[in-house]
């Protein structure tokens, strides 16, 4: 299927990779079909959640577990049922990223992850019932904090 996109130009996508969001994504409820696109490097934690029906709409997304090492939550039963999840191995979790002009202020939404069942290509954004996570978690700040922690661990080993 040929798709005209804002970020990638005209691309050919495999229709079997289209993810159906039954209720859309909050704020974009009428747009229900998306595909996950890689921006060159498949090892990068960043991806694009590209809408199939509106080539202008794409969300920058990130694998939150690659950024926040202790990110942990239970998928709500309603989402498990709605998405037909049978195994955690069939689940992809993404966080929507906001990239402002000042890239050092880039944030990710840990409070409302996008959950995708990769087995049946159903997805939804789920709002977690916890105060532990924020809708604006600073990515660069988190990565710097991890570097400091890793560095501190290295110093301990040398002593």
Curated annotation (Swiss-Prot):
Gene Ontology BP term (one):
regulation of translation
GO cellular component term, pick one = cytoplasm
Is the Ubl conjugation keyword given for this protein? no
Quote the InterPro entries the UniProt record gives. Answer: Flagellar_assembly_factor_FliW (IPR003775), Flagellar_assmbl_FliW_dom_sf (IPR024046)
Gene3D superfamilies registered for this protein in UniProt: BH3618-like
Query: Major place of localization?
Result: cytoplasm
UniProt entry keywords in alphabetical sequence: Bacterial flagellum biogenesis, Chaperone, Cytoplasm, Translation regulation
- Location in the cell: Cytoplasm
Q: Which SUPFAM superfamilies match?
A: BH3618-like
This protein's record includes keyword Membrane: no
Task: Give the protein's biological function.
Answer: Acts as an anti-CsrA protein, binds CsrA and prevents it from repressing translation of its target genes, one of which is flagellin. Binds to flagellin and participates in the assembly of the flagellum.
Spell out the NCBIfam families in the cross-references.
Answer: PRK13285.1-1, PRK13285.2-1
Name the record gives this protein:
Flagellar assembly factor FliW
Classification from the root reads: Bacteria, Bacillati, Bacillota, Clostridia, Eubacteriales
């Amino acid at each position: 299927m040929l798709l005209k996109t804002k970020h990638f130009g005209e691309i050919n996508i495999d229709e079997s990779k289209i993810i159906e969001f039954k209720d859309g994504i909050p704020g974009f409820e009428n747009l229900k079909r998306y595909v996950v696109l890689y921006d060159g490097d498949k090892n990068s934690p960043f991806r694009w959640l590209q809408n199939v029906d509106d080539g202008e709409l794409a969300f920058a997304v990130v694998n939150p577990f690659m950024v926040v090492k202790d990110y942990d939550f239970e998928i709500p039963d309603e989402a498990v049922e709605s998405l037909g999840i049978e195994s955690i191995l069939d689940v992809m979790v993404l966080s929507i990223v906001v990239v402002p002009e000042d890239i050092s202020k880039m944030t990710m939404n840990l409070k409302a992850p996008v959950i995708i069942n990769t087995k049946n290509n159903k997805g939804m954004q789920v709002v977690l019932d916890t105060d532990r996570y924020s809708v604006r978690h600073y990515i660069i700040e988190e990565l710097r904090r991890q570097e400091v922690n890793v560095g501190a661990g290295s110093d301990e080993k040398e002593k």
